[in-house]
Amino acid sequence: MHQMTLAEIAKGLEAKQFSAEELSRALLARIAQLDPQLNSFITVTEDLAIEQAKAADARRAAGENGALLGAPIAHKDLFCTNGVLTSCGSKILTGFKAPYDATVVEKLKAAGTVTLGKLNMDEFAMGSANESSHYGAVKNPWDTSRVPGGSSGGSAAAVAARLLPAATGTDTGGSIRQPAALTNLTGIKPTYGRVSRWGMIAYASSLDQGGPLARDAFDCALLLGAMAGFDAKDSTSVDQPVDDYLAALAQPLAGLRIGLPKEYFGAGLDARIGEKVMAVVEELKKLGATVKDISLPNMQHAIPAYYVIAPAEASSNLSRFDGVRFGYRCENPVNLEDLYKRSRGEGFGAEVKRRIMVGTYALSAGYYDAYYIKAQQIRRLIKNDFVAAFKDVDVILGPTTPNLAWKLGEKNADPVSAYLEDIYTITANLAGIPGLSMPAGFVDGLPVGVQLLGNYFQEGRLLNVAHQYQQVSDWHKQAPTGF
């Protein structure tokens, strides 16, 4: 059963080949057996899962028949889950059990999904390797000496290892797409405002967006359809109807205009990844797409701009974690200042502290104009590049990552080298457009991802292109040995 996609699970449950409870018990046993090799879960919610699975079976017995009714998933551990530890991968949230469900959790629960647990992640979603978690590094099931990507590394590793069919993630600078690429999954970051951020603990409020990771575009469409939509509780949510993503999948690609940005294929890209990307382009041409070269000239400024804006927002967002109201508190503080300093000093990890300091510096009176305002101006130029490009093309295609999954610990001494791994993904967050990564083959046994970028609220088109490619390829069906 663990090899089944969400679509196959829905058919099996409908045909009464197995119950949601049987499926959940089988996957919980698999998690107990295999996750010690990966460390993808922070919390396994066994009792909750069985309770939800029984409820899903009862709903089905009463005649209900939703596509996600009884589907087992797990949530990245920054979505608040009522009564369950929500840690953000940080010591500072030790023991914090949210008193409510995030909107994403609520919507998926209403659709009948079964929550198997909370997934490991880079601390407060800051990282590209899932090595900064207080709960330990996550390992890539394709090679357990390598990183799975980040920050949604637990989500990616668990789905890739067939511990569960799909999971939620979040993407601030590539945190769904990059791990999807490094673990052979399909993952989509929706348009900013498409999925509610209420109850999703913030890293950088103007960049964060939740989305699904799954094995194929069909399953992503299923999940995104349930996750997306306006939420009055989230002031950044956009009140626009949600497309029928499943209906969009079948659209033929004849006449689709694909743009290849020259900036995505220059220095820094592993040539073997470039070859895999061009092989995907050739397949899409056979399916009727046309291809043209384009330019996104301001992409070169994306990483510096992102690493001013995101830490600036993080330094503000993370100021609420002070040892007073919830989570970790230092022992025997001598006064209030000592409580703040030591609780935060002991509670946050090195990467989070680094970004808080960078962000506080960028927002300080003497440097605000030189850094923060300048970064926001660059952000507007990047957005303008995309607006211009989408006048001539429907989808922009390129590699998701410049390199294959690297060895655990390899980039720890040089954080900038890890930041550069997000070079192709960050621009979508700065501009707020949707982006998807899909499997495109293997180099030396390690997965390669291709990224598709679309215009605002064109998630359906990205899922359509990925689905059509997955009808003529089987990369997405390959599973790691030993899992």
Curated annotation (Swiss-Prot):
Catalytic activity annotation: L-glutamyl-tRNA(Gln) + L-glutamine + ATP + H2O = L-glutaminyl-tRNA(Gln) + L-glutamate + ADP + phosphate + H(+)
Domain of life: Bacteria
E.C. number: 6.3.5.7
Any GO molecular function: glutaminyl-tRNA synthase (glutamine-hydrolyzing) activity
InterPro entries hit by this protein: Amidase, Amidase_CS, Amidase_dom, AS_sf, GatA
A Pfam short name: Amidase
Active-site residues, as the UniProt record annotates them: 76 (charge relay system), 151 (charge relay system), 175 (acyl-ester intermediate)
GO BP annotations, alphabetical order: translation
Keywords, alphabetical: ATP-binding, Ligase, Nucleotide-binding, Protein biosynthesis
GO cellular component: glutamyl-tRNA(Gln) amidotransferase complex
Protein family: Belongs to the amidase family. GatA subfamily.
PANTHER family xrefs: GLUTAMYL-TRNA(GLN) AMIDOTRANSFERASE SUBUNIT A (PTHR11895:SF151), TRANSAMIDASE (PTHR11895)
Subunit structure: Heterotrimer of A, B and C subunits.
Role of this protein: Allows the formation of correctly charged Gln-tRNA(Gln) through the transamidation of misacylated Glu-tRNA(Gln) in organisms which lack glutaminyl-tRNA synthetase. The reaction takes place in the presence of glutamine and ATP through an activated gamma-phospho-Glu-tRNA(Gln).
Name of the protein in its database record: Glutamyl-tRNA(Gln) amidotransferase subunit A
Native source species: Ectopseudomonas mendocina (strain ymp) (Pseudomonas mendocina)
Gene (UniProt): gatA
